[in-house]
């Protein structure tokens, strides 16, 4: 499968930099990212087997790469902080093992 950059994951009640995320904050986060990356899309973590966390709204970029390292290099080139972008592979079968690689 192809690797894509995961650039955000938020769930209800999550607190980041003093902001408590509800639906409006999750959507605002997505819209901000989509303005910078028009190919960004959002999925619910429960709909895919590669995510270990449940109830997350995950923003990914529809720019695919053959390897996790290539994906993470894209994250570096875009200037993302290490924890804000990493390689992910969307899967409907299997589990999280081997389907994400942090930087």
Task: Label each PLM-derived region with a short phrase.
Residues 1-103:
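Acidic/polar low-complexity segments and flexible, solvent-exposed patches
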């Amino acid at each position: 499968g192809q690797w894509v950059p995961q650039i955000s994951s938020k769930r209800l009640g999550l607190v980041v930099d003093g902001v408590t995320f509800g639906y409006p904050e999750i959507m605002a986060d997505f819209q901000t990212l989509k303005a910078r990356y028009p190919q960004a899309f959002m999925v619910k973590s429960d709909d895919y087997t590669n995510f270990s966390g449940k109830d997350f709204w995950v923003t990914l970029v529809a720019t695919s790469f053959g390897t996790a390292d290539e994906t993470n290099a894209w994250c570096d080139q875009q200037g993302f902080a290490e924890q804000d972008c990493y390689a992910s592979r969307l899967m409907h079968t299997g589990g999280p093992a081997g389907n994400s690689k942090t930087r």
